[in-house]
Amino acid sequence: MARTNKPRVLIPSGQGLNCEEETAFGYKILGAETSIVHINDIIAKPAMLEDYHILALVGGFSDGDHIASGKIHANRLRYGLERPLGRFIDDGKLIIGVCNGFQAMVKAGILPALDNKRETGMMTLTYNDSGIFEDRWIHIIPNKKSKCIWTKGIEEIYLPVRHGEGKASFPSDEALRRLESANQVALYYLNPETRKIAKEPDYPNNPNGSINGIAAVCDPTGRIFGMMPHWEAFLSPYNHPNWTRLKTEGKLPKEGLGLQVARNGVEYVKDNLLG
């Protein structure tokens, strides 16, 4: 990609990933430039990462979810791109993973990076407690103490989840304590009636049984971020499942609320990475 004075987003595709087009569209709405590139081509020419500010790891069913959701995709990232991705992160750039992308980041050790150590086994995203594929819209709220740059300005957001393995789990209570004490939990599932975090087993508000209602986490810098809900599925107000009622009541938002997540990343690049 020819360098321009705009935020540039690299979106890997292929091998069963399937949310790249709407992800690219969301960033384009916000004025960013995007490239959709097959993951094999990125591994073959990893120097291309130097041309981008944001790496967007999208959702889908990479490799048919064989072994575990995102596991094979994670191995590509870990063994095919470990050093280039390490430089990308150390250069102050951004990574966002959504659903399958989040699963891959966790299983590759990119997240949660406790104490800034990118190692595997510190958390996982495993089978939903419900035992079924969850496809529903849910309420989420931010952890306002988090350093996550992707969730700034968000009060509450309504987004869809689409996954069979979204339960945030940890190898020990100590790993969970370290994550929470560092305020690396970025988003929680919300019970809209009680206005409290939807901790397990508050189903379906917590759609997968995630420990302590965890819906998204970031690394200690706040720049590297993974979330189970799909921000890119709410780009237009007409994506909302109740848009007709909201329009009748005069409550239809001007834009899809998922855009705020991507906007935060784009604005961070403008403020910190563009000369």
List each language-model region with its residue ranges.
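C-terminal and late-domain segments of enzyme folds
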Residues: 142-275
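A short, compositionally biased
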Residues: 134-136, 181-182
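N-terminal beta1-alpha1 cap of cysteine-dependent amidohydrolase-like domains
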Residues: 1-98, 102-112, 117-120, 126-134, ...
